[in-house]
Swiss-Prot record:
Residues 333-428, 624-718 form the SH2 domain. Residues 113-301 form the Rho-GAP domain. The lineage of its organism: Eukaryota, Metazoa, Chordata, Craniata, Vertebrata. The gene is Pik3r1. Belongs to the PI3K p85 subunit family. The record marks 151 as: Arginine finger. This is Phosphatidylinositol 3-kinase regulatory subunit alpha. Disruption phenotype: Double knockouts for KBTBD2 and PIK3R1 have increased body weight, normal fat storage, blood glucose and insulin levels. GO terms for biological process: B cell differentiation; cellular response to insulin stimulus; cellular response to UV; extrinsic apoptotic signaling pathway via death domain receptors; growth hormone receptor signaling pathway; insulin receptor signaling pathway; insulin-like growth factor receptor signaling pathway; interleukin-18-mediated signaling pathway. Polyubiquitinated in T-cells by CBLB; which does not promote proteasomal degradation but impairs association with CD28 and CD3Z upon T-cell activation. Phosphorylated. Tyrosine phosphorylated in response to signaling by FGFR1, FGFR2, FGFR3 and FGFR4. Dephosphorylated by PTPRJ. Phosphorylated by PIK3CA at Ser-608; phosphorylation is stimulated by insulin and PDGF. The relevance of phosphorylation by PIK3CA is however unclear. Phosphorylated in response to KIT and KITLG/SCF. Phosphorylated by FGR. Phosphorylated by CSF1R. Phosphorylated by ERBB4. Phosphorylated on tyrosine residues by TEK/TIE2. SMART domains: RhoGAP, SH2, SH3. It comes from Mus musculus. Residues 3-79 form the SH3 domain.
Length: 724
């Protein structure tokens, strides 16, 4: 269900004056429901003139706040369909390469390649990524009048500096670092972004504007309009504006640093655009476009207009119809004992205010963790329990977790932490997770299982192929970096030899001239030319290798992008396949039939049939249910047993059970939840009507879907194995 609405962009900063207002930051995107304007008596067409409307009530998509804002502070963008907030598909995300023990330059090159996209590095009210701000402030402080800035390459490795800043940017003292190293790190930062600051989608229009318009004033206005929202992403626009301010400041000191707008545009257009296989004409037009933008003053802002008169609003009494007496187990937002990784997956790319509650990782009875989406990141808040009361911090005042959560669904968490100015708006419901299976008969579900499993296998093969290529390319890059270092050392040795030869040759040439020995003179000159020629050959070889390395590094980044674009699909396909498989298992479908749909007739894997269900010792609960045993006794019983040997015991957590199983020669423990929907290791898998039903399912299904370190099935009941 969606409604019609309008979008506006903030032109000025506004600090709220009343409780019902919301803050505005330059560039914020706001949405207003059409119905709210109709209710105020405004007709179609007037939405495009917000300054005539006065105060509008809407939703700030950038900050996640809803309230009133002045129409004189915004501009109209266009119409938009407004839908209730739903989780978005997971976009590709670059993953950092695991650091190795060796700190060679090749390793540094590899580790410094991945960078998060701009949208993941910062969010308004920040005007640019913190790392970028720190670099440019240091460059402007140390090198504003430097005559070689951005044109002299430093001897240090900028990747090492960027990696250091990435880890702990606040603690690094840039005063001690040479300005050319900082400049190289800045250029490297722009080059390593997964996507260019200026998106490819606007290249053609920028070139046309730079080529066709004769008046610089007209061109500036149209270019400014082109590079604003919604043509480019919000973070890209803010970052580009920050860069242009930096370039403008440098160009104002061009009499000393020799960096006018033209020179700066030539230096930075390749990393701002990354236009592949561009003709020289296209490149020239893009350089001209950047030159025009740099020449424009970006620091000055027009003063904000006067606020429109604001009518008094009637006060409303908040109606809290939420049930504080509800059991925690029945709350849709309570997920029990799930891992932090699963929580991150469920909250990925959701709106600010999305939340869920799980058991605290400390496993202390009564302690829980609230995970809340704020500013595009997950915020973890501990819920403490003491003397029958709950809360985030002392004094604990709430009678239950449900009462605590319901309170903050109406009130901002700024009461607890000023930086968390958001309400608990959108619960992640555990009851909506099982609606994946839409078909209503077993045969239709089986066909869909076969379809999803086939897609999963194809994606897996594609990912494996890319991973092999990724690994091979990484190794080749390291080898080429090592070879370039060897070339550098060789060139250094030859140049020293050449200098030595020149120094001594002068004396001998003078001597042989006096003696009239032309033959010896020719021999000395020939040897010198031969040495020079050899140096040139080595330098050419190094240059070709550097070009190959540059191309291969681009390929490496492209492979990494493709892998990250496939990974979300792979994860989603696996989850969907497993949900279909679980649905069929719950309906009592035999393993033989499942294997046919999965294509496992002749292949043994986690879904293969080991032995007929009727013959399994698992049917006798006495072989694995040891009652009220503790962790130490369980470990003693399982010590020395083969992988897959297990038992089930009562847990120290009231109302739950624990499964102890041997994995890779070690005994591991995991909680079995008992909920209103059934037994299970985690939501949404708490579906089994009895412990026996759960044990029979995981006899042929690996626990790895719940925990990466538990790649094992419940194969051998502890007492059944002893009786054998």
């Amino acid at each position: 269900m969606s409604a019609e609405g309008y979008q506006y962009r903030a032109l000025y900063d506004y600090k709220k004056e009343r409780e019902e207002d919301i803050d505005l930051h330059l560039g914020d995107i706001l949405t207003v429901n059409k119905g709210s304007l109709v209710a105020l008596g405004f007709s179609d067409g007037q939405e495009a003139r917000p300054e005539d409307i006065g105060w509008l009530n809407g939703y700030n998509e950038t900050t996640g706040e809803r309230g009133d804002f002045p129409g004189t502070y915004v501009e109209y963008i266009g119409r938009k369909r407004i839908s209730p907030p739903t989780p978005k598909p997971r976009p590709p995300r670059p993953l950092p390469v695991a650091p190795g023990s060796s700190k060679t330059e090749a390793d540094t090159e590899q580790q410094a390649l991945p960078l998060p996209d701009l949208a993941e590095q910062f969010a308004p009210p920040d005007v640019a990524p913190p790392l970028l701000i720190k670099l440019l402030e240091a460059i402007e402080k140390k090198g504003l009048e430097c005559s070689t800035l951005y044109r002299t390459q430093s001897s240090s490795n900028p990747a090492e500096l960027r990696q250091l800043l990435d880890c702990d940017a606040a603690s690094v003292d840039l005063e001690m670092i040479d300005v050319h190293v900082l400049a190289d790190a800045f250029k490297r930062y722009l080059a390593d972004l997964p996507n260019p600051v200026i998106p490819v989608a606007v290249y053609n229009e920028m070139m046309s504007l730079a080529q066709e318009l004769q008046s610089p004033e007209d061109c500036i206005q149209l270019l400014k309009k082109l590079i604003r929202l919604p043509n480019i992403p919000h973070q890209c626009w803010l970052t580009l504006q920050y860069l242009l301010k930096h370039f403008f400041k440098l160009s104002q000191a061009s009499s000393k640093n020799l960096l006018n707008a033209r020179v700066l545009s030539e230096i930075f257009s390749p990393v701002l655009f990354r236009f592949p296989a561009a003709s020289s004409d296209n490149t020239e037009h893009l350089i001209k476009a950047i030159e025009i933008l740099i020449s424009t003053e970006w620091n000055e802002r027009q003063p904000a207009p006067a606020l429109p008169p604001k009518p008094p609003k009637p006060t409303t009494v908040a109606n809290n119809s939420m049930n504080n007496n509800m059991s925690l187990q029945d709350a849709e937002w309570y997920w029990g004992d799930i891992s932090r990784e699963e929580v991150n997956e469920k909250l990925r790319d959701t709106a600010d205010g999305t939340f869920l509650v799980r058991d605290a990782s400390t496993k202390m009875h009564g302690d829980y963790t609230l995970t809340l989406r704020k500013g595009g990141n997950n915020k973890l808040i501990k819920i403490f329990h003491r003397d029958g009361k709950y809360g985030f911090s002392d004094p604990l005042t709430f009678n239950s977790v449900v009462e605590l959560i319901n309170h903050y669904r109406n009130e901002s968490l700024a009461q607890y932490n000023p930086k968390l100015d958001v309400k608990l708006l959108y619960p992640v419901s555990k009851y909506q997770q099982d609606q994946v299976v839409k078909e209503d008969n077993i045969e239709a579900v089986g066909k869909k299982l076969h379809e999803y499993n086939t897609q999963f296998q194809e994606k897996s093969r594609e990912y494996d192929r890319l991973y092999e290529e990724y690994t091979r390319t990484s190794q080749e890059i390291q080898m080429k970096r090592t070879a370039i270092e060897a070339f550098n050392e060789t060139i250094k040795i030859f140049e020293e030899q050449c200098q030595t030869q020149e120094r001594y040759s002068k004396e001998y040439i003078e001597k042989f001239k006096r003696e009239g020995n032309e033959k010896e003179i020719q021999r000395i000159m020939h040897n010198h030319d031969k040495l020079k020629s050899r140096i040139s050959e080595i330098i050419d070889s190094r240059r070709r290798l550097e070009e190959d390395l540059k191309k291969q590094a681009a390929e490496y980044r492209e492979i990494d992008k493709r892998m990250n674009s496939i990974k979300p699909d792979l994860i989603q396909l696996r989850k969907t396949r497993d949900q279909y498989l679980m649905w069929l298992t719950q309906k009592g479908v035999r393993q033989k039939k499942l294997n046919e749909w999965l294509g496992n007739e002749n292949t043994e894997d986690q879904y293969s049939l080991v032995e007929d269900d009727e013959d399994l010792p698992h049917h006798d609960e006495k072989t694995w249910n040891v009652g009220s045993s503790n962790r130490n006794k369980a470990e003693n019983l399982l010590r020395g047993k083969r992988d897959g040997t297990f038992l089930v015991r009562e847990s120290s957590k009231q109302g739950c059970y624990a499964c102890s199983v041997v994995v890779d020669g070690e005994v591991k423990h995991c909680v079995i939840n008992k909920t209103a929907t059934g037994y299970g290791f985690a939501e949404p898998y708490n579906l089994y009507s009895s412990l026996k039903e759960l044990v029979l399912h995981y006899q042929h299904t690996s626990l790895v879907q719940h925990n990466d370190s538990l790649n094992v099935t419940l194969a051998y009941p502890v007492y059944a194995q002893q009786r054998r």
